[in-house]
Curated annotation (Swiss-Prot):
It is found in: Cell membrane; Cytoplasm. The keyword Protein transport applies. Coiled coil: none annotated. The gene is secA2. It catalyses: ATP + H2O + cellular proteinSide 1 = ADP + phosphate + cellular proteinSide 2. Monomer and homodimer. Part of the essential Sec protein translocation apparatus which comprises SecA, SecYEG and auxiliary proteins SecDF. Other proteins may also be involved. Part of the Sec protein translocase complex. Interacts with the SecYEG preprotein conducting channel. Has a central role in coupling the hydrolysis of ATP to the transfer of proteins into and across the cell membrane, serving as an ATP-driven molecular motor driving the stepwise translocation of polypeptide chains across the membrane. InterPro entries: Helicase_ATP-bd (IPR014001), Helicase_C-like (IPR001650), P-loop_NTPase (IPR027417), SecA (IPR000185), SecA_Actinobact-type (IPR026389), SecA_CS (IPR020937), SecA_DEAD (IPR011115), SecA_motor_DEAD (IPR014018). This is Protein translocase subunit SecA 2. It comes from the Bacteria. SMART domains: SecA_DEAD (SM00957), SecA_PP_bind (SM00958). PANTHER family: CHLOROPLAST PROTEIN-TRANSPORTING ATPASE (PTHR30612:SF0), SECA INNER MEMBRANE COMPONENT OF SEC PROTEIN SECRETION SYSTEM (PTHR30612). Its EC number is 7.4.2.8.
């Protein structure tokens, strides 16, 4: 234990004497020893810039991996029972300094080989140690992150910690738990998994295991559902301890600000159809450009003065910008405009089985259980002629970022951590450890082929794929959206190329399609490859044609355009050249691509082309890199600005959760109501048992606390819909949001306690049994969970407002 009373591991979350998320020992000044150069080694200065652990800590990990080889024979000579017993005898309580780490690695290597048939490479053991040090590791596709993660999970569990291996979907949670379960069992550890189909009892059992595999959604939904229970025995989610996150950049960056929502039945009205229809007419009008305008990167849309006048006239001559309508009618109009102008079918969503399904842009597949904020969801459904779905009342919500920050220790793994290093450091205080490949990467990455127009680019892509296919080399094509993937697929088929397509419309087939993408002559067209979870092996899943395909150059990756972040490009490139196999990649771009149009001055772009419309300037690569850096900077700003809004809500939620736990687990509710209403308490004490009276008091206090929090969330949602309009009055929207949120929260506690006192004093005494009639404290008859793809509010400043101590 360190001076903070926390295990000396890299995710100690104490804030009083050292930065949150980094251990005190990580901030001592070290003079690195001069050591022999290691594969993939970076300078210590570069490590510090990345927020990564010190050079000494990395050197210690390398030394431990080397030392573990001395124990390999001893581990191999142990029976299964003795191997399990040896694992249990390890002293790993102090993971940062334990002398038993080499023995642990040797036991883990032997257990993995016996139970999974996989013998971990040294780089996998190094990756496991860096995760045990609290870092996010970067390991290339095909290098064995799943096994490295299981070994790290075993290390934490043997140190007495409870580990949640956080995945991006249910399929990977169950697959990895069943795949790695025998390894953990061989080391005397228990493993469980959770999916959307798991019952409450199955969830409790899984969480009770040493290591639990579950998707980030399911973990979050369990946390939310626990905020409705009125009996401590109904709780499902345990206290958070260690989160080991697979595809860490996807979970911690791409989806960090996605709110997970618990909703209940309600009778709230949906947005007015007359406004949705009116906006549809505006957008479809031949003079539509006169009625609304979008910004340069198509992220925002607003009415022009002419458009506002037309809407006002159609709605009976109202003033959209009056106090009466600015926060209601104008907001509805803007939401409907967003649905009709900015959100495109087969790009942002698809329609299947008479329902709108969102597409996860970073994964290229349907975003399960995800929806837009209720007004926008209804507007899109109306746009597509689909019956509006029930919205419900938000009972509780938590962002993925706030969910993960609950854990005492956070670490993870991904193929593209370095590019997300800034966000990981800024929002989670996490370092990044790049892990060298087991075999040198010999993939050849060709310079971008840039065209003057999208049409010329698409022609070039089809010609290139056809040419590569004719020699039998397998091709993986990464597109940016569903519409593009289907259009390209159709063109290839017309050219006689037997391509298969993998996108959000057929993601159920993804494992089979990806597994065969390395076969001789295969052409696979796919939307984003992040988190697909299946390796592409040369020669197909059985590698029957491995040598033949390798001689042709291995898998050839084609990107149909740069993404807004380099990470997504690298995730696609990384599919080629796994485990030392040959491979190649090339990206096609045009001056009309979104990332270029939004981030470069069109008048300064070189325009000289060859006969096929390809730009001949040597500056194209640097210009594309610059456009991508600008786009990444904007995304970071959006993350930071949105975080500033969500952070206050997260802090308020933490106060509510603490108060709720106190009411749920102690006699506080009974004591407070006895003090507030002594006569009624004395009256009831003579009629009901102390245990029954305690239950009644707890139910009353919890109901009004939950009711107050749900009302507070609804109020904050209403504020956020129109807070940006405060800028018209020269007010800072963020400052105003914080002021209003803090003022409202300050009265929440008093109002909840006052309402509880009133219920306690006025509820009728039951005739047929001892107790009070609490039928008016009706909770939702049904609840459901989903994710909200929220539109981030943007602002440039953060005002530090303190939270009042509302509960004493």
């Amino acid at each position: 234990m360190n001076v903070h009373g926390c295990p000396r591991i890299a995710a100690c979350r104490c804030t009083d004497t050292h930065p949150r998320g980094r251990p005190a020992f990580a901030y001592r000044w070290f003079v690195p020893k001069t050591t022999r150069a290691q594969p993939g080694r970076l300078s210590s200065r570069f490590w510090r810039l990345l927020g990564a652990s010190t050079e000494k800590n990395r050197s210690r990990s390398l030394a431990d991996v080397t030392a573990s080889a001395e124990y390999d024979k001893e581990a191999a000579d142990l029976s299964d029972e003795k191997l399990r017993k040896a694992a249990g005898l390890l002293n790993l309580d102090d993971l940062a300094e334990s002398a038993d780490i080499p023995q642990f690695l040797a036991i883990a290597r032997e257990a993995a080989e016996r139970r999974t048939g996989l013998r971990p490479f040294d780089v996998q053991l190094l990756g496991a140690l860096r995760m045990l040090a609290g870092d996010v590791i970067e390991m290339a596709t095909g290098e064995g992150k799943t096994l490295a993660g299981a070994i790290a999970a075993a290390g934490y569990a043997l140190a007495g910690r409870h580990v949640h291996v956080v995945t991006i979907n249910d399929y990977l949670a169950r697959r990895d738990a069943e795949w790695m379960g025998p390894l953990l069992d061989a080391m005397g550890l228990t493993v469980g998994w959770i999916t959307a189909d798991s019952t409450p009892d199955e969830r409790r059992t899984a969480y009770d295991r040493d290591v639990t595999y579950a998707s980030v959604n399911e973990i979050g939904f369990d946390v939310l559902r626990d905020q409705l229970v009125t009996d401590v025995n109904d709780l499902v989610s345990p206290n958070p301890d260690v989160a080991l996150i697979d595809e860490a950049d996807s979970v911690l960056v791409d989806e960090a600000l996605v709110p997970l929502v618990l909703a209940g039945t309600t009778h709230r009205e949906t947005p007015r159809l007359e406004i949705i229809r009116l906006v549809a007419e505006l957008v479809g009008d031949k003079d539509a450009d006169e009625y609304f305008a979008t910004d340069s990167d198509n992220r925002n849309v607003h009415l022009t003065e002419h458009g506002a006048r037309k809407v006002e006239k159609a709605l009976g001559g109202i003033d959209l910008y009056s106090e009466e309508h600015v926060g209601t009618t104008l907001t509805e109009v803007n939401v409907a405009l967003h649905a009709h102008v900015l959100l495109q079918r087969d790009v942002h969503y698809i329609v299947r089985d008479d329902a709108v399904h969102l597409i996860n842009a970073s994964r290229g597949r349907i975003a399960q259980l995800q929806r837009w904020p209720d007004g926008l969801q209804a507007a899109v459904e109306a746009k597509e002629g689909i019956e509006t779905t029930e919205t419900g009342e938000v009972l509780d919500t938590i962002t993925v970022q706030a969910l993960i920050n609950r854990y005492a220790t956070v670490c993870g793994m991904t193929g593209t951590a370095l590019a997300a290093g800034e966000q990981l450091r800024q929002f989670y205080q996490l370092g990044v450890s790049p892990i060298p490949p087991n075999k040198p990467n010999i993939r050849e990455d060709e310079a971008d082929r840039v065209y003057i127009t999208t049409a010329a680019k698409n022609d070039g892509i089809v010609e290139h794929i056809t040419e590569v296919h004719q020699r039998g080399q397998p091709v993986l094509v990464g597109t940016r959206d569903v519409a593009e993937s289907e259009e390209l697929h159709e063109r290839l088929v017309r050219r006689g190329v037997p391509a298969v397509v993998l996108n959000a419309k057929n993601d159920a087939e993804e494992a089979r399609v990806i597994a065969e993408a390395g076969k001789y002559g295969a052409v696979t067209v796919s939307t984003q490859m992040a988190g697909r979870g299946t390796d592409i092996r040369l020669g197909g899943s059985d590698e029957a044609d491995h040598d033949r395909v390798a001689e042709l150059g291995g898998l050839h990756v084609v990107g149909t355009g740069r993404h807004h972040t380099e990470r997504l490009d690298n995730q696609l490139r990384g599919r080629a050249g796994r485990q030392g196999d040959p491979g190649s990649s090339v990206f096609f771009s045009s001056w009309e691509d979104d990332v270029v149009a939004a981030n470069l001055d069109h008048n300064k772009l070189p325009m000289a082309t060859d006969e096929n419309g390809r730009i001949v300037s040597p500056r194209t690569g640097s210009l594309l890199d610059h456009a991508q850096r600008v786009a990444e900077g904007r995304l970071l700003d959006v993350h930071a600005n949105t975080w500033r809004y969500n952070q206050l809500i997260a802090q308020q939620r933490a106060i509510i959760v603490e108060r709720r736990n106190t009411l749920l687990r102690t006699v506080t509710a009974r004591e407070e109501l006895a003090e507030l209403a002594p006569k009624r308490y004395e009256e009831l004490s003579d009629k009901v048992s102390e245990e029954r009276l305690e239950t009644i008091c707890r139910q009353i206090m919890l109901y009004h606390l939950d009711r107050g929090w749900a009302d507070h969330l609804a109020y904050l949602a209403d504020i956020r819909e129109s807070i940006h309009l405060r800028a018209l009055g020269r007010q800072n929207p963020l400052d105003e949001f914080h002021r209003m949120a803090v003022d409202a929260f300050a009265s929440l506690a008093a109002d909840a306690i006052e309402a509880a006192q009133q219920t306690f004093e006025t509820a009728n005494v039951l005739d047929h049994e001892p107790g009070l009639d609490l039928s008016k404290l009706a909770r939702p008859t049904s609840t459901w969970t989903y994710m909200v793809n929220d539109n981030p509010l943007s602002d440039d400043t953060l005002s530090a407002l303190s939270l009042p101590g509302v509960f004493r």
